[in-house]
Amino acid sequence: MRILVTGAAGYIGSALVRALAAHEVIGTDQSAPAAVLGNIAYPQFARSLVTPEIDTVFHLASLVSGGAEQNFELGSKVNLDATRDLLEACRLAGHCPKFVFASSIAVYSGVDEIDDDTAPAPQLSYGAQKLVCEVLIDDYTRRGYIDGRALRLPTVMVRPGSANTAVSGWASAIIREPLTGRDYNCPVRPDTRMACISLRRVVDAFIKLNELPGNVIGPTEPYCSPVSRCPRSKCGTR
């Protein structure tokens, strides 16, 4: 199997590339150890990555939440436009590759409880960009251009090295910094709760999501209730 991984030099991407070592993996990023170096924000580069030989695209490259909020134009280019360029490359390649997308729970609002019925309501540009990409992936899948699936990630921790610009970066820092002998002033209240996941489980989830057949995952479809049921559900029956 020939696999393309964008964001291959990142925290999640590099771990995913290692886990896929049994396959032929083409990793791309702006820095080593990615095999193909380039900026996915440039349309020509993004569209050159998908060839008819690619079986699966893992699209992990993104500008994280804080960065996308600070620089709307760059966030739109990296998170939204580059994703559409990759989708177009898949469409033009003409062989319906799998397209596994790293989405985010940032598509939701700040509610405490989230389940499968929770409606998306992003509060940041990053979440809005991820949600738009999900809709595009649904449509490209519906039309038979790709076999798309998306994973809405919570905070992945503990991220090594220096902090990135993610809004939730403090969650790794409160563990990482003391372990390296550095003080850290936590910017949130002591009773703050957030969804977290380990790197190993994220990598496993991506691989399992890729292996699932499309008919098991199923399309994202709204349920339309007959108009006659609306008054009944609101007012009851006699």
Language-model-detected regions and their locations in the chain:
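Glycine-rich NAD(P)-binding loop of the Rossmann-fold in SDR/ketoreductase-type enzymes
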Residues: 70, 74-85, 120, 124, ...
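Active-site Tyr-X1-5-Lys
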Residues: 110, 121-149, 180
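NAD(P)-dependent short-chain dehydrogenase/reductase
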Residues: 138-193, 199-207
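Rossmann-fold cofactor-recognition segment
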Residues: 30-43
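Conserved Rossmann-fold NAD(P)-dependent oxidoreductase catalytic core, especially the SDR/UDP-sugar
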Residues: 84-124
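N-terminal Rossmann NAD(P)H-binding glycine-rich loop of SDR-like oxidoreductase domains
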Residues: 3-22
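NAD(P)H-binding glycine-rich loop region in Rossmannoid oxidoreductase-like domains
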Residues: 40-78
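Mid/C-terminal beta-alpha module of Rossmann-like enzyme folds, strongest
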Residues: 208-238
